[in-house]
């Protein structure tokens, strides 16, 4: 069995087709098909089943996929350690993140990391909180940004307590002029985030045992701001999500203050490959500087 066969199997499983896997690996379709067939022959059972909707893993394929991913990670770690002994810094770091981190932090993190380690490749996958946690657990990414509480089995480093704010259309007046209380949400139409994207709002509602009415849901931060701007309701948004968006909305803090705790997660910090470990340290240092006001930017109306 070869590493090439492992790479082919994982690429097909993740991309859902032989053609997409071939494109990703820069191989011909016939080379991908041959590598898969040889792998299946050595194993003695089929890994994939082709049907009209595409390709799906067999039970055997599902069972082997996590182990094959781990083998590839171990090989990458070995090559990085060998490169480090030669005085080089190389490898690949895969990061999972939700939208506001992807917009507010990651561009600066990647740029500054590239200045330090120009030979390390960084790839980004964006999704909801649960998506990112699942990618970490399945070894599809090395590091991921999620919020507390974290799923069992993840190693997390707290990064930042991100204040939660209420955004409202112009002309909106809370009971006090300076802030809004969580129970007041029940008095208004609330624009909610889509499933897996609004856990912080769900946590506030559950914490205060509040039931709200909602006529709109959206995943994209900009879409939520636009819906609120149009006068269709108010919404709860993290401060980080508002830094890079402008809109004709009012922003009110909660009293008592509400927040989400953003953490950097991995399967195990100790077992991270050198490149991923360097990125982990870089992210922690960056966010510490950012939260102290060294690199904040953006504004909102």
Regions found by a protein language model. Give the residues of each.
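Short helix-boundary/capping micro-motifs
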Residues: 11-28
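A short LG(V/I)-centered, amphipathic sequence patch enriched
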Residues: 40-59
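Alpha-helical linker/hinge and terminal dimerization helices associated
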Residues: 42-43, 64-86
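Central regulatory/effector-binding core of bacterial HTH transcription factors
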Residues: 90-152, 218
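A late-sequence structural motif
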Residues: 105, 251-295, 300
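Beta-alpha-beta core module
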Residues: 153-158, 162, 223-271
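Flexible hinge/capping segments at coil-to-helix
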Residues: 154-190
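Secondary-structure junction motif
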Residues: 174, 188-209, 272-280, 287-293
């Amino acid at each position: 069995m070869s590493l090439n066969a492992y790479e082919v199997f994982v690429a097909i499983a993740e991309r859902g087709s032989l053609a997409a896997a071939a494109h990703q690996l820069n191989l011909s379709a016939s080379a991908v098909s041959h590598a898969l067939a040889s792998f299946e022959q050595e194993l003695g059972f089929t890994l994939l089943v082709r049907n009209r909707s595409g390709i799906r893993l067999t039970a055997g394929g599902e069972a082997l996929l996590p182990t094959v991913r781990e083998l590839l990670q171990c090989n990458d770690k070995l090559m990085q350690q060998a490169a480090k002994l030669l005085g080089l810094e190389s490898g690949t770091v895969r990061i999972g993140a939700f939208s506001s981190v992807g917009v507010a932090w990651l561009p600066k993190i990647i740029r500054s990391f590239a200045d330090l380690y120009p030979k390390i490749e960084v790839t980004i996958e964006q999704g909801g909180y649960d998506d990112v946690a699942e990618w970490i657990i399945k070894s599809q990414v090395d590091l991921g940004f999620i919020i507390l509480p974290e799923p069992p089995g993840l190693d997390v480093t707290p990064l930042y307590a991100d204040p939660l704010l209420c955004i409202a259309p112009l002309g909106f007046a809370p009971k006090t002029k300076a802030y809004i209380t969580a129970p007041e949400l029940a008095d208004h139409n609330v624009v909610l985030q889509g499933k897996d994207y609004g856990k912080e709002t769900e946590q506030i509602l559950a914490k205060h045992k509040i039931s709200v009415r909602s006529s709109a849901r959206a995943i994209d931060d900009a879409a939520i701001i636009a819906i609120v701007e149009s006068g269709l309701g108010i919404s709860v948004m993290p401060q980080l999500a508002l830094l890079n968006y402008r809109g004709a909305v009012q922003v009110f803090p909660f009293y008592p203050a509400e927040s989400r705790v953003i953490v950097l997660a991995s399967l195990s910090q100790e077992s991270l490959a050198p490149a991923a470990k360097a990125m982990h340290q870089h992210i922690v240092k960056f966010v510490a500087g950012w939260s102290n006001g060294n690199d904040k930017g953006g504004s909102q109306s």
